[in-house]
Amino acid sequence: MEKKPYYITTAIAYTSGKPHIGNTYEIVLTDAIARYRRAQGYDVFFQTGTDEHGQKIEEKAKEQGITPKAFVDGVASTVRETFDMMNTSYDYFIRTTDEGHEKQVQKIFRKLYEQGDIYKGTYEGLYCTPCESFWTESQLVDGCCPDCGRPVKKAKEEAYFFRMSKYADRLMKHIEDHPEFIQPESRKNEMVNNFLKPGLQDLCVSRTSF
């Protein structure tokens, strides 16, 4: 009898610094689910990895006098060693600087652009470099990032956007038809009430100046 496929992934660890307890907590939980599904007879593919792009990485590398690639090589190695030390059973460890990953991203990006789902526009917002987060004026606390309290800077540039608004109705219907699609319930409510019902916004998918 052919096994039913089951794909599971962690979020990919950001490589601006050493792995932390949140990374290990997540990989252990995901590993437990993967092992449970294998025991149930599923053909499990368990993926994890590292996110190796961002302004914070560039700044950390500059502080150490090395290239961003050399910096993320060291952090990615530490992340993988940590996951291996915990005997997690992942099948594939992806790095966003891997040549294969870059080629696949470019292929998907071109396909989406050709079919009109990605377009060029202008992105403008208030950006916190340490948190790598954008905020609106109303979200700031005394003019600073609400998470870390540091100053933010205005950022405006040409960027590419994914036409997410095009799929709002389809997403809402899928969630209504498959109530278990987003779990736990609190996260489903957050997605529906905070994003879909107010009007799903197009997503910026590129950066050029930061």
Question: Language-model features: where?
Answer:
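A broadly conserved sequence feature marking short terminus-proximal activation segments
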Residues: F71-Y127
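Short low-complexity, flexible loop/linker segments enriched in glycine and/or proline
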Residues: E59-E63, K107-I108, W135-S138
